[in-house]
Amino acid sequence: MFGSKFKICKIEAYEVIDSRGFPTVAAKVYAKNGVFAKAMVPSGASTGEREAVELRDGDKERFNGKGVLKAVNNVNTIIAPKVVGMDCRQQTKIDELMISLDGTPNKAKLGANAILAVSLAVAKLAAMIEEKPLYKYIRQNIMGDSSDSWTMPVPMLNVINGGAHADNTIDFQEFMFMPVGAKSLKEAVRMASECFHSLQSILKSKKLDTNKGDEGGFAPNLKNADEALKLMVEAVEKAGYKPGVDADVAFALDPATSELFDADKKTYTFEKALKAKILTAKDAVKKSEDMVKYWDGLCKKYPIISIEDGLAENDWDGFQLMVKDLGSRVQIVGDDLFCTNPKIVKEGISKGVANSVLIKVNQIGTLTETIETIKAAHAAGWTCVVSHRSGETEDTTIADIAVGLSTGQIKTGSMSRSERIAKYNRLIEIENELGSKAHYPGKSTFKSIK
């Protein structure tokens, strides 16, 4: 018989608001004496076809159809009666039960947002009762790993936004700083902050817009990626650092090209640049091999160390070409390509379509499946990047996941907007707790790069 203090006594879900002003699911999971843990679920703007289903109400009279009362009700009336009474340390058993209660391959019945809220809250409750921080509970109790050396993640900081995350003329979604030359997480955050403010002053001096996108980066109207990357080089240098893959600050891109892809024609169209007449109709349309050449050219001109979703999620042939041409010097990250799904990741490993996986807990919907995906990637020698979503909350669980599972990289927005900063502050707190046991890997986190 398990210890009664670990017995789940009550579960309640309710609507809260995310950083874009839309509802999302929160869940509280209670043990005895009123002890509880809470989790809030994020939401994406550009979503992959294979993502687990985020259940929305569709009632146009309420939150423009984006309410989540159906998902909340599924927690309170379907999940809670089955999970109440279970031991909160039985993470895998609870997650598998919720998956079976749903019964669909993509969690379409109950909603991944319903299932994930409970899954994360269960882990947080068990950690609390064990009197451990969540990252230690994940490693020691869920993974059964007693090692006591901890890898802090190198952050990817989104400083220029475009694509679906901003109302501007840039077709690519994210341009990011990576402080690879820092000696600690705290120093990485300081370097990133200084470069961020340096970029802001440069944009102002050039009379460019300093409004922010969903993830806290700037959203100026620029002609192309070259302009954005030149500004980033200037910002790093003005802040007193050296841009470079082997220097202080490297760059990462997330163009989110699935948003640009025409599956029938198998071409990519730079729609924003075309609409703004920055590119001609001929130059705005590219084939897979053209895109790979384009990325190759940018990587030769700028210190780009990582490209996420450089091709569309269904363009596996294109990804194989990209890995062949760029994979030894650039981290090729699959986001929409894999949707944090362990089965798809394993197929991708066998076909060599990337060398890194983006990890978004709400793409798959349980902590157990998230861990399975990370384990599969690490076993193949691939890297993992734990990621936020464009619609976030002040929940900091992903910071603990990144440390607990030694992913070595995290992508959680810019140096503005408190729902992003919350994750950095949690990482600083973890690094302070760990002291000399914390290791910041810098460039060595990129295992595939020679």
Curated annotation (Swiss-Prot):
(2R)-2-phosphoglycerate binds at Q173, K360, R389, S390, K411. Disulfide bonds: none annotated. Binds a second Mg(2+) ion via substrate during catalysis. InterPro entries: Enolase (IPR000941), Enolase-like_C_sf (IPR036849), Enolase-like_N (IPR029017), Enolase_C (IPR020810), Enolase_CS (IPR020809), Enolase_N (IPR020811). Keywords: Cytoplasm, Glycolysis, Lyase, Magnesium, Metal-binding, Secreted. Catalyzes the reversible conversion of 2-phosphoglycerate (2-PG) into phosphoenolpyruvate (PEP). It is essential for the degradation of carbohydrates via glycolysis. Belongs to the enolase family. NCBIfam families: eno (TIGR01060). This is Enolase. It comes from Malacoplasma penetrans (strain HF-2) (Mycoplasma penetrans).
